[in-house]
Amino acid sequence: MKNFFLSQIENLHNLDSGNFFIMAGPCVVENEKITFDTAEKILEITEKLKIPFIFKSSFRKANRQKIDSFTGIGDEKALKILRSVAEIYEIPVVTDIHNQEEACITSQYVDIIQIPAFLCRQTELLVAAAKTGRVVNIKKGQFVAPESMQFAAQKVVDSGNKKVMLTERGTMFGYQDLIVDYRSIIEMQKTGFPVVLDVTHSLQIPNQQSGVTGGKPDLIGTIARAGIAVGVDGIFIETHPNPAEAKSDGANMLKLDLLESLLTRLVQLRQTILKFN
């Protein structure tokens, strides 16, 4: 794996292992215990497998289909929990923002600022994120061609920040499905920035009549293995001790006790591919 600017991210370990990196954690901060327990378990696994690990969890979910859907436990409370994760476990943390004001606020708590897929073309949001000086992870919109992501990245660069990641999270395939075009990974890597594959949101089943997004978590391994096969730099995966009881995106997340076996297989696949290359 090319180090890019990743070596500049505080507490991002195992970069010399040759492995992909992962961004992993529960969809949203539900409480301190679930957040801490999940971070601790993922750290244990990634240290064993020598995988660079960035903890991910949203401090608030702004994009909900129904007005009564769970959005969070309170911004300040959630951000303080994320900061505690970074300090206690000595790992970098990423969370997403939804407007310019949140860029400045979240940058005081996390190492990486994430731009949601639906907001990937919002110029003022990208500029605000860039000006924090934090790494900016831009998720490719389900409606955006991979070649067009160079322009989103350039907005960050032209704002004085060259620390950009791009994330593939699927493309609309009709009204109620997404599909991963693995050519997107290759196309976005042409920008020179690290490219991540979101293996959980790529399996969403949107626009359900219930108003709650569905998913196909049984295919997470398939999507992830294909991503490793084409040479993706990082894997984004949401995981939870009990997805059935999760307050957001439970239908998409991988059960935490399945994570080690999945990552073990991905590392083995990565090593095999590197031998041939």
Q: Model-predicted segments: where are they?
A:
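Structural preference for beta-strand elements that scaffold enzyme active sites
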Residues: N19-M23, P52-K56, P92-V94, D111-I112, ...
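N-terminal amphipathic alpha-helix/helix-capping segment at the start of soluble metabolic enzymes
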Residues: M1-I22, Q271-N277
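Catalytic beta/alpha-barrel core
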Residues: I73-G74, I88-E102, D111-E124, V135-P146, ...
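Glycine-rich, proline-tolerant flexible connector loops at the mouths of alpha/beta enzymes
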Residues: I22-T35, F53-D75, H240-D249
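A cross-domain feature marking catalytic cores of carbohydrate-active enzymes
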Residues: P26, F55-F59, T95-I97, A117, ...
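Catalytic alpha/beta core domains of metabolic enzymes, predominantly
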Residues: G133, N137-T239
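Alpha-helix-loop-beta-strand connector modules within alpha/beta enzyme cores
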Residues: I42-E44, K48-L49, D68-V94, A129-V135, ...
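Active-site-adjacent loop and "lid" segments of alpha/beta metabolic enzymes
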Residues: I67-E76, I112-L119, Y175-I179, L203-I228, ...
